[in-house]
Amino acid sequence: MGGLAMEEMPLSVLFEQARKIHLAASESGVDQDVVKKGCEMFQKCEDMIGKLALFSSNETKEDISTNNLKYLLVPYYLAELTEKIIQEDRIQIVKASYAKLKEFFSFCEAMELVPDEELEASSRGGSGAPADRRALKIARFKRQKAAEAKLLEIKERKERRGRSTKASALSTPVESGEDDIPDDDSEEEREAWLSSINLAICKAIDLLEMLKREEEMLSAIKERQLKDGEGGFSRDALDDRTKKAETWHRDAAARIQYSKPAQPITCATFAQDVLEGRASVSQGHEHKNQPLIFGPASIVGGPLSTERERMIAQVFQPSHRMPTMCIEDAGLTEMNIMNDWQEQTKKAIEEATTSWYNDKPLRRKEEDEEDDDEDEEAVMKARAFDDWKDDNPRGAGNKKLTPCG
């Protein structure tokens, strides 16, 4: 889109094209040329609004038509796009964006669009109790969420009405009536633009505070650099550092082709080898963590031979007992204990199984002998009872008790 085409475009088309660029820059990163083109288009919109005299200082929001409400957002959109421009002199960008936001805020204040609590906070210059500032931010956040919800509701309502209109157009012809009223003059369109302006006011106040702090920080850094006699990092110095880093990495990559470093022995790799059967637990491994030595004991070399050396070594020692082995050694010890326990359990199971099979015939023989003994005892008992019955016939002991006896 060349300059001639931009000059020939009407205000409404130019505004919509610039707003699309602003939307794309807000949702995702765009090229700097596109951002600058959007700034030029919004500046052209400002010039056309001034030439057409769409707004007056003695007007309020009720006096502005629905078609012209959206043009109140031009300074805000221009400020946001300007803030996204990347250049070396960041302070100039911050100042330009801050000026446009102040212009937008002042114009909304004249149109009676800014809430009273925001006007009071602006008159105080940001000073006040922390609780008051916190309450103001909470109220601003609630207004922002309410405006976003309102815009979403209007958008969904338009989509539903569009679908129903399309369906009715396919079934019956459209009659002239209320559906012929332009959307630009409808209350819904006006409500949508007012909600957009309220949302922009909330975001503009937060952006003003952020830009003010950024300008103060950049000014302080610049003053310090001027005071120290430094103009900042020069481009040559940065290029020199980059070349040195690239050379070092290139040389390191060349050396790695001819030198193969030894594989470090770590506890993790040793334990993995033990678990997968490539190494035995009994094999010592080189990763040893020696316990820390504190106090004078750290400067005493060799064993403690005299009582004096032992007393010196006990000075400034920890109040708790130090570990006698590292975690890796403790794990290997536990693994040894587990392997011994498994071997003993396996051996006991094998012995129990073997003895059970070997003792089975002997147990069967003993059981047979016990059964034979029990049979003989039963026969002898039965024979003795038969002999007793022969010696004592039935009723022999009751003869003296009978009347005829």
Swiss-Prot record:
Phosphorylated by TOR kinase in vitro. Residues 159-189, 352-405 are annotated as: Disordered. One of its GO terms (molecular function) is protein phosphatase binding. Pfam families: TAP42. It comes from the Eukaryota. One of its GO terms (cellular component) is cytosol. Residues 165-174 have a biased composition (Polar residues). The keyword Phosphoprotein applies. Keywords: Phosphoprotein. Induction: By chilling. By abscisic acid (ABA). One of its GO terms (biological process) is TOR signaling. Involved in the positive regulation of the TOR signaling pathway. Acts as a negative regulator of PP2A catalytic activity. Plays a positive role in the ABA-regulated inhibition of germination, probably throught its interaction with ABI5. Belongs to the IGBP1/TAP42 family. This is PP2A regulatory subunit TAP46. It comes from Arabidopsis thaliana. The lineage of its organism: Eukaryota, Viridiplantae, Streptophyta, Embryophyta, Tracheophyta.
